[in-house]
């Protein structure tokens, strides 16, 4: 091979950079058939053929002198640059030398569908297992309870039947004796005794049933699925062991039948298993002169091999261990000699007994050696009924604890298993064990004999038997090979499509399918090649040729000699072909692993092989050229002194050989070149073919997933529509109907209760009046009697008191001095203070005391009080003067007030606002905004007593945008009711918090909180600043406001006014009452007649203002 140049060692100038990287790193870059070797969710995915094309900047960044080394790059790939040579990817050296390139992993495009499927199905499987375990735990309790109750009922029925039959028998027996009657005391005692006896039986029956068989709750002990699988596996292994024991005979060993028992745990002497492989490399089988070295087998038990942790030992598992005879943790049969009963006095004899290993196949038994270990004996177990009863009681009390324990271990088991799958945890391999093949012949008895003490007859028999065994073994190997191939193929298919829990199948990818297709194509090609010449046809043709070539005596052959020779050549050619096929077949069997690796060789590796062949051809060329030159030189020297004829002949021969060499070299070079081109084109064609298949499968998978998703989406939409139309809509309609008409029902109920209340009050009033009359009537009688008695009292003379005269003069009104009105200069205080004038006081005039005047001469003397008369006259005069004064003062005040207001309006234009004044104005505006933006009472507000009583024929507009959910489960669509129009949810209005009705005409009737005299109505809509895109076309335009005595009395309604809401005005607009009704208003209706163009109309906030009227 030609030496490598300096350019080949330079990465930048190397022609095939992938070859350079793989040569320097020791690792080949993978191709599209490489398996995924990265851990799920731990490393980022790599770029693949469907990744977006890299830009020039990215290419420069990936292939330039980076300060760090990247793990992979697709910069030098034919996917992005078809002019580059055929290679896949190149690791970036990051500006370092090639010597620092360490061995690293490369990842090819991988499908994560398998891992995604496992992640999606794992929570479902986990939940199903947990539910199954909980149901199984409850099932055990229910099963115990149901069977116990059923047995208890059957026992009661049986007890009743027994008692009834005894009673009938007793009655029949006593009826035979005439005139014999038992005393009453005997009958009563018997009845009492039977009653208590039945009562005791009924109470103690459950206890007797539970303790009858002396079985505790261990018979219902919960076992996981893994325990069940272990038991099934142990059972299968035991069956194999027993079958092998019955089918094999061992000379000199005990043939006692196996026996099953429940022995006690005793320490004694027993044996250790020793196995040996009986396969021999000798073509004549195992010779007697060769010594077999036994191999001591130490295997882990099923419980120790398990990846996931086992449940804690219970009494049932300990009893199972106690019952084991051959393996302490498995329940299998053992011959009688291992019992303590037979080995009690014979332990020194070391009698070997056959025992079999529990593995994937049965092991061959060889002479055994004693070892100190555990053995078992029979022992009858006695139970304790009281302990059993307490065990049951504790189990029933602590059942939640047991259930929680099962649930915990279930989560722990499957959680650890999932963690191992996600992290690609590889468990430790099992210990090696020498096992015997299923078709392997059993060892003969001569294997254990000494070669010196065997006669020559036995040796010949052994030789013949071993020779026959070798032939049989050869056939068995061939058939086992075919069987193994079939089993591996089936296992491979099963791992691809059914091995959902196998760790190897968790790395499933489309690359395996492509590899499988390649293997199938190769198998079809091989099958066609092997079956090209049918054996029967070939034999028939050979027989025909032989018959045709026969000739009779004294006659010429029927077939010419050259045809017969051609047939023989054909026959021997076929034999050579069959020999070559056999060689290839054997090569495949013994080089299966090498061929398997070649099956996944990258495409560029074949180029490397071709280039290697070219390099070998170059070397061969140089070697042959040197050899011929050496021969030519030697021949020239040898025959130099020969004759010219010999020299010329030598030259001719040299020229001939040189020409042959040149011809051969040129032919080989052409063959190598054509072979290389053919392999390259064939690999490209195969690659393109499988790439097309892969793309088709990928597109089919994507379209299938999309179809399934669309089907599920359609199914979900249909379910949602069914739920809405048939479940939610009727329920919502009922609730809406109830919400819209609850006031009607409430009024009816209130009227009924009002009538009942009035009736009760009237009855109570009548009763109370009667009670008061009955109480007051005796007192009235006593009072009348007392008055009648007082008429007969003596008469007394009453002295007349003289009335003094008083003169009240007229008050001097002119003396009241009117103070000039002050000029108001303070703008913020516009109220005028009215100073009331003092009322005139009367001036008392002393008068002499006149003599009493006798008015009427009767039994009672009456007098006139002058002070009372003066006081009455004074009060009348004062009232008249006050009214006149108030009238004149009001006229004066109104005149001065108008004058001051005009002056203030003129002065306001020149007012300068200072800081305090502005602060006062701002506070006034904040106060007005805080009082519902109006500073007036809203009698339609729901929180103060207002209510929406009707919407007439208005149909609510539903947007189906507010979906209510419960635990992320959609329940129903929420929409605002008409009540939101008179509610104050916040100080500001937000888009959507309104009641919308269809089209542009609608009604809303409101019951006010009080009877009022309506002065104005205000309506507020959202501003254009908060509306989306400033669109407020759903605002009302023309409105009518009506007043009702009763909401259903259309004849009494009065139009307060018709108004237009100006969309260009402020959001809150006031409308003064144009017509005031002549009755106190309790019901107000807003009728919208038009809007600003939307297919629906929205109402945000309605207010009604006025003054309360006492009714």
From Swiss-Prot:
Q: Where is this site: May be involved in the interaction with lmn-1?
A: 91
What keywords would UniProt list here? Cytoplasm, Cytoskeleton, Developmental protein, Membrane, Nucleus, Signal-anchor, Transmembrane, Transmembrane helix
Instruction: Enumerate the subcellular locations listed in this protein's record, separating them with semicolons.
Output: Nucleus inner membrane; Cytoplasm, Cytoskeleton
Listed Basic and acidic residues bias regions: 243-252
Tissue-wise expression: Expressed in all somatic cells. Not expressed in germ cells in the mitotic and transition zones of the gonad. One study shows expression at the beginning of the late pachytene stage in the proximal gonad, but there is no expression in the male germline, suggesting expression is specific to oogenesis in hermaphrodites.
Q: Which residues lie on this side of the membrane: Nuclear?
A: 1-509
Where are the bilayer-spanning segments?
510-530
Induction info reads: Induced by DNA-damage.
Topology, Perinuclear space side = 531-1111
Please describe the quaternary structure of this protein. Component of the unc-83-unc-84 LINC complex which contains at least unc-83 and unc-84. Within the unc-83-unc-84 LINC complex interacts (via C-terminus) with unc-83; the interaction is probably required to recruit unc-83 to the nuclear membrane. Most likely interacts with anc-1; the interaction is probably required to recruit anc-1 to the nuclear envelope. Interacts (via C-terminus) with zyg-12 (via C-terminus); the interaction is direct. May interact with lmn-1; this interaction may be required to complete the connection between the nuclear lamina and the cytoskeleton.
**Name listed for the protein in its UniProt record:** Nuclear migration and anchoring protein unc-84
Species name: Caenorhabditis elegans
Species lineage = Eukaryota, Metazoa, Ecdysozoa, Nematoda, Chromadorea
């Amino acid at each position: 091979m030609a030496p490598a140049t300096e350019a080949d060692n330079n990465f930048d100038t190397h022609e095939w950079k992938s070859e350079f990287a793989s040569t320097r790193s020791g690792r080949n870059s993978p191709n599209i058939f490489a398996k995924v070797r990265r851990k799920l969710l731990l490393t980022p995915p790599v770029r693949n053929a469907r990744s977006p094309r890299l830009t020039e900047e990215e290419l420069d960044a990936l292939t330039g002198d980076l300060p760090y080394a990247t793990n992979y790059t697709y910069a030098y790939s034919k996917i992005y640059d078809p002019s580059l040579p055929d290679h896949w990817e190149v690791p970036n050296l990051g500006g370092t030398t090639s010597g620092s390139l360490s061995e690293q992993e490369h990842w090819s495009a991988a499908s994560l569908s398998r891992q995604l499927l496992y992640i999606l199905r794992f929570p479902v499987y986990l939940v199903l297992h947990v539910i199954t375990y909980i149901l199984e735990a409850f099932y055990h309790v229910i099963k115990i309870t149901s069977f116990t109750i059923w047995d208890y009922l059957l026992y009661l029925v049986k007890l009743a039947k027994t008692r009834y039959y005894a009673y009938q028998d007793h009655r029949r027996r006593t009826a035979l004796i005439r005139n014999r009657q038992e005393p009453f005391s005997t009958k009563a005692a018997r009845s009492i005794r039977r009653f208590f006896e039945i009562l005791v039986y009924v109470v103690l029956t459950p206890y007797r049933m539970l303790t009858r068989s002396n079985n505790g709750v261990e018979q219902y002990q919960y076992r996981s699925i893994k325990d069940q699988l272990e038991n099934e596996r142990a059972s299968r292994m035991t069956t194999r062991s027993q079958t092998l024991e019955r089918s094999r005979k061992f000379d000199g060993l005990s043939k006692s039948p196996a026996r099953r028992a429940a022995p006690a745990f005793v320490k004694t002497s027993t044996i250790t298993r020793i196995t040996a492989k009986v396969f021999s490399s000798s073509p004549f089988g195992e010779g007697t002169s060769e010594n077999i070295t036994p191999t001591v087998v130490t295997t882990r038990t099923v419980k120790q091999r398990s990846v996931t942790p086992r449940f804690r030992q219970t009494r049932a598992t300990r009893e199972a261990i106690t019952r084991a005879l051959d393996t302490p943790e498995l329940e299998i049969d053992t011959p009688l000699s291992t019992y303590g009963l037979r080995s009690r006095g014979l332990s020194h004899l070391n009698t070997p007994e056959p025992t079999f290993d529990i593995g994937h196949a049965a092991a061959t038994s060889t002479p055994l050696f004693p070892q100190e270990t555990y053995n078992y004996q029979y022992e009858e177990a006695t139970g304790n009924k009281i302990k059993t009863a307490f065990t049951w009681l504790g189990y029933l009390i602590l059942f939640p604890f047991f259930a929680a324990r099962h649930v915990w271990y279930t989560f722990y088991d499957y959680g650890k298993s999932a963690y191992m799958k996600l992290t690609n945890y590889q468990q430790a391999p099992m210990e090696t064990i020498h096992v015997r093949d299923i078709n392997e012949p059993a060892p003969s008895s001569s294997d254990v004999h000494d070669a010196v003490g065997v006669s020559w007859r036995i040796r010949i028999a052994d030789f013949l038997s071993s020779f026959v065994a070798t032939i049989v073994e050869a056939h068995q190997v061939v058939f086992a090979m075919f069987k193994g191939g079939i089993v591996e193929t089936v296992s491979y298919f099963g791992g691809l499509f059914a091995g959902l829990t196998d760790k190897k199948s968790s790395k499933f990818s489309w690359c395996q399918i492509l590899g499988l297709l390649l293997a199938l194509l190769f198998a079809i090609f091989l099958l066609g090649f092997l079956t090209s010449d049918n054996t029967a046809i070939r034999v028939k043709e050979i027989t025909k040729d032989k018959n045709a070539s026969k000739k009779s005596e004294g006659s010429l052959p029927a077939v010419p000699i050259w045809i017969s020779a051609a047939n023989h050549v054909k026959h021997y050619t076929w034999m050579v072909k069959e020999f070559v096929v056999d060689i290839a077949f054997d090569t495949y069997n013994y080089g299966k692993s090498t061929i398997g690796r070649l099956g996944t060789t990258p495409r560029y590796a074949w180029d490397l092989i071709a280039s290697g062949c070219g390099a070998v051809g170059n070397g061969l060329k140089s070697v042959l050229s040197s050899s011929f030159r050496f021969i030519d030189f030697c021949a020239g020297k040898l025959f130099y002194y020969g004759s010219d004829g010999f020299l010329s002949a030598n030259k001719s021969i040299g020229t001939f050989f040189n020409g042959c060499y040149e011809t051969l070299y040129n032919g080989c070079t052409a063959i190598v070149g054509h072979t290389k081109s053919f392999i390259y084109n064939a690999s490209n064609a195969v690659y393109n073919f499988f790439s097309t298949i892969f793309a088709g499968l990928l597109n089919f998978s994507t379209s299938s997933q999309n179809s399934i998703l669309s089907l599920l989406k359609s199914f979900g939409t249909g379910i949602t529509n069914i739920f809405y139309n048939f479940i939610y809509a009727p329920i919502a309609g009922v609730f809406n109907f109830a919400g819209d008409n609850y006031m009607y029902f409430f009024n009816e109920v209130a009227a009924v209760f009002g009538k009942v209340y009035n009736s009760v009050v009237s009855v109570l009033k009548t009763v109370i009046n009667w009670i008061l009359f009955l109480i007051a009537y005796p007192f009235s009688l006593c009072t009348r009697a007392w008055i009648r008695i007082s008429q007969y009292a003596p008469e007394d003379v009453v002295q007349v008191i003289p009335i003094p005269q008083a003169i009240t003069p007229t008050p001097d009104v002119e003396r009241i001095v009117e103070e000039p009105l002050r000029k108001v200069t303070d703008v913020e205080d516009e109220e005028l203070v009215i100073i009331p004038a003092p009322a005139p006081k009367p001036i008392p005039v002393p008068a002499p005391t006149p003599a009493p005047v006798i008015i009427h001469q009767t039994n009672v003397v009456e007098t006139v009080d002058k002070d009372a008369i003066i006081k009455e006259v004074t009060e009348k005069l004062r009232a008249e003067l006050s009214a006149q004064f108030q009238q004149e003062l009001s006229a004066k005040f109104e005149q001065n007030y108008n004058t001051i207001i005009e002056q203030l309006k003129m002065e306001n234009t020149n007012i300068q606002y200072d800081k305090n004044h502005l602060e006062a104005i701002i506070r006034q505006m904040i106060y007005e905004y805080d009082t519902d933006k109006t500073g007036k009472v809203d009698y339609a507000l729901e929180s103060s007593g207002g209510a929406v009583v009707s919407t007439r024929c208005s149909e609510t507009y539903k947007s189906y945008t507010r979906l209510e959910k419960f635990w992320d489960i959609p329940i129903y669509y929420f929409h605002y009711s008409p009540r939101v129009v008179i509610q104050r949810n916040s100080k500001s209005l937000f888009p959507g918090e309104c009641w919308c009705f269809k089209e542009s005409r609608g009604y809303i009737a409101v019951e006010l909180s009080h009877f009022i005299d309506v002065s104005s109505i205000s309506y507020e809509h959202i501003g254009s600043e908060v509306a989306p895109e400033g669109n407020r076309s759903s605002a009302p335009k023309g409105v009518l406001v009506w007043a009702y005595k009763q909401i259903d009395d259309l004849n009494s309604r009065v139009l307060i006014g018709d108004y237009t809401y100006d969309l260009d005005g402020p959001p809150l607009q006031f409308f003064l009452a144009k017509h005031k009704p002549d009755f106190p208003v309790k019901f107000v209706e807003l009728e919208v007649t038009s809007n600003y163009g939307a297919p629906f109309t929205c109402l945000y906030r309605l207010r009604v203002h006025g003054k309360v009227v006492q009714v």
